[in-house]
Curated annotation (Swiss-Prot):
SS bond list: none
Every SAP domain range: 132-166
Listed Basic and acidic residues bias regions: 298-325
UniProtKB keywords: DNA-binding, Metal-binding, Zinc, Zinc-finger
Bias (Polar residues) ranges: 326-349, 405-419, 472-502, 522-532, 546-565, 575-591
Protein name as catalogued: Zinc finger CCCH domain-containing protein 62
MF term (GO), any: DNA binding
Segments crossing the lipid bilayer: none
Length: 702
């Protein structure tokens, strides 16, 4: 019998209790106190002493997303779509809310142990005796925790809270009867009002979306005091925190329970309030509430507007970035298809300068002769730009020597007879081209300068030959009386322009110190007739056996400017009586002061005459040309020395000081620079010279 009894006890122990079965059945569904389930968020919150006192207070547990439909300050359009909000909140249904609601099923109190039962009995006894101050702090908090009340504050606050809870529990409906709620405050409730309102409780399946309503299971009437009201920062929804004074109906709330409810749910059913002792104070509280609501709505409007502006700026920025990227892609593609080759003007000019001049003139490009530098010299640039000016006043002479070029000193042209010098220049250039072969493939700039008289025909009316008196028979007979210097010149010193194709300024021949045979007068005359000199604007120097030279004298009258005239202010011509002071090579230069007649007029070395016959018209042209070419050059006393004269012509525009050149120092280095005086061809041929003592050539032929 004992064994079956034990088996029955084990079987009963294995079976679940009926109370547990009921709890499991009830746990399959959850209850919602009203048609809006969001007010359930405040249910089941356990206030413990470890919580922050400020956060645990009823004023700090309001929902920031609460609102009101009936409140004048409530904006219904700002509430949003309730169905969408319900769907989103349904996904959070299985969080802490479900576990908290399990502890409050119906009106059952939580299970208490022996200590809790002893504490409740002790509190009831002390309350009945009026000795509630004997409770300790931890005992006060234990009592409040059992009734889910706030635990913040000191002992006095805790004792006051316990007295109020006991009073409300026993005398709540007596102290706050339904008949005392006489004023309708639907849509206009504020902090401090004592209100009564109803709630509908719906039941739905656990885990179902919150937007889906369940079936109605009951109603509940609540009476409480509004201890806090606020506007949410996100949606400006009005939220109330109500301390329950009494509750009856389906699953009533315990006394002094803090209930969080939205304004629209509070104002959904009829809401009534008790009158205040001072209604003016309520009006002030109501105005302060409306002001906060106005500021909250304005802040929300500004925030929405800023958010819209930011969205538009973001869209515009994206469009601009997209357009810029498209433009960059188009530029890159265009550059890839059509590359741009930038060629500067200098590059084109350099390429043009590198063209071989021989190809332009039909000559072979592989000529063994040396070519001039492709870079333009200052002379070439001047010759290139001179035709652009209507009245050229400077002429450059280029002397070629083994691939080098030099610009002669520019001289001021006398504008009285410019056609004479151009005519002589053209004839001289033509003779040089016929007698000597081209030295360089590149044409000499002297050929370009010969075209100037053709470009300026207005000067041709000045091309008139000056009349000259023919010499007498005695003067013609004196031509046959030549000296050893004339014979030495005619036999051994050919014109440098024919031998080397250049002038004395750029080329000099080696001078032999041995005596030369004396030619006959017939040979001298025949030589001058067969080979007249064809050089112009050039100075030739030849060594004499004795090494003597005669200084030059002025050959023009600066005041009258009579060039080649037969009328002279000085005495008549006397042959072989030219007053000139010889200067020995290597001397200290003490005699050059006597050799100089006119110190103010600078006379460069004159070239030989074009022809030895007085009938030739070019002879007169040559004389006039020398006057125009050398007439206006000035030279100071310190600049001119007859031993340095040819060096001044050689260097052109380069200045020389007293220490640059000395006869003794440079004699071994370049002995060709010292030139003796040349015999006067006119005097040898005609026996008299129109220049007289002013002639720069030597008349002493003995």
């Amino acid at each position: 019998m004992a064994a079956p009894a034990a088996d029955d006890d084990d079987h009963r122990a294995a079976l679940p209790r009926e109370e547990d079965d009921g709890e499991e059945e009830e746990g399959s569904e959850e209850e919602v106190e009203s048609d809006d389930e969001e007010e359930e968020e405040g249910e089941g919150y356990d206030w413990s002493e470890e919580d922050d006192p400020e956060a645990a207070s009823l004023a700090g547990i309001c929902d920031p997303d609460a609102g009101s439909y009936d409140d004048p300050t409530f904006d219904p359009a700002a509430d949003g779509d309730l169905e969408v909000d319900a769907v989103l909140r349904s996904r959070m249904a299985r969080m802490s809310l479900s576990s908290a609601r399990k502890d409050r099923k119906g009106s059952r109190m939580p299970k208490m142990g022996k200590e809790e039962m002893d504490l409740l009995a002790m509190v009831d006894k002390l309350m009945h005796d009026g000795q509630l101050e004997k409770l300790k702090v931890y005992e006060c908090k234990a009592y409040l925790r059992m009734h889910k009340l706030r635990l913040s504050g000191n002992k006095e606050v805790l004792l006051t809270r316990i007295r109020g809870q006991i009073e409300v529990k026993t005398m709540g409906e007596v102290k706050y009867p339904v008949s005392s709620f006489v004023l309708n405050c639907q849509g206009d409730s504020c902090k401090g009002d004592v209100v009564v309102f109803e709630q509908n409780i719906y039941k739905r399946k656990k885990g179902a979306p919150r937007g889906v309503k369940g079936h109605l299971c009951g109603q509940r009437t609540n009476a409480g005091r509004i201890i806090k009201e606020s506007y949410g920062t996100k949606k400006q929804q009005h939220t109330f925190t109500i301390e329950i004074l009494w509750s009856r109906g389906y699953k009533p709330w315990p006394p002094l329970h803090p209930l969080l409810i939205k304004g629209r749910n509070l104002y959904k059913d009829k809401t009534m309030r008790q009158p205040w002792l001072d209604e003016e104070e309520r009006n002030r509280a109501l105005q302060e509430k409306h002001a906060r609501g106005y500021v909250a709505r304005k802040t929300r409007e500004v925030r929405i507007k800023d958010k819209e502006n930011e969205r538009m700026r973001r869209l515009n920025r994206n469009k601009e970035n997209k357009s810029k990227g498209q433009d960059n892609m188009n530029k890159k593609s265009s550059q890839a298809v059509f590359p741009q080759h930038t060629v500067t003007t200098n590059t084109v000019q350099k390429r043009a300068e590198k063209i071989i001049p021989s190809l332009q003139h039909g000559e072979s490009g592989n000529s063994s002769q040396q070519h001039l530098s492709s870079k333009q010299t200052p002379t070439e640039q001047l010759l290139h730009y001179l035709p652009q000016f209507p009245h050229p006043q400077q002429h450059n002479e280029v002397l070629l020597q083994k691939g080098t070029s030099r610009t002669s000193t520019t001289q001021l042209i006398n504008h009285q007879a410019p056609s004479l010098q151009h005519a002589v220049k053209v004839e001289t250039t033509q003779q040089q081209q016929q007698q000597q072969p081209p030295k360089s493939i590149k044409p000499a700039p002297i050929q370009q300068s010969s075209a100037y008289p053709q470009q300026y025909p207005k000067h041709q009316h000045h091309n008139q030959a000056l009349p000259r008196v023919p010499p007498s028979q005695e003067q013609r007979a004196a031509v046959s009386q030549t000296s050893a210097a004339r014979q030495d010149f005619t036999n051994h010193q050919a014109p440098p322009s024919r031998q080397h194709g250049g002038s004395e300024n750029m080329r000099r021949q080696e001078i032999s110190s041995r005596p030369t045979p004396t030619p006959t007068p017939q040979q001298a005359v025949s030589y001058t007739q067969q080979q007249p000199p064809n050089h112009q604007y050039r100075n030739e120097a030849f060594w004499q056996q004795g090494g003597t030279s005669t200084s030059r004298t002025g050959f023009m009258d600066r005041q009258s400017n009579n060039w080649g005239s037969t009328d002279h202010d000085k005495p008549a011509f006397q042959p072989f009586t030219q007053k000139a002071k010889t200067y020995q090579h290597g001397s200290n230069g003490s005699g050059h002061h006597q050799a100089r007649v006119d110190r103010e007029t600078h006379q460069p070395l004159r070239s030989r005459n074009q022809d030895y016959h007085w009938e030739d018209q070019s002879y007169h042209h040559q004389q006039n040309h020398h006057q125009n070419y050398y007439g206006h050059r000035q030279m100071s006393q310190d600049q001119y020395h007859h031993q340095q004269n040819h060096h001044q012509n050689y260097h052109g525009r380069q200045g020389m000081n007293g220490n640059q050149y000395h006869d003794r120092q440079n004699h071994n280095q370049n002995p060709q620079r010292f030139r003796p005086w040349k015999p006067c061809f006119i005097y040898q041929q005609q026996g008299w010279c129109p220049y007289g003592e002013n002639c720069k050539f030597m008349h002493d032929l003995r």
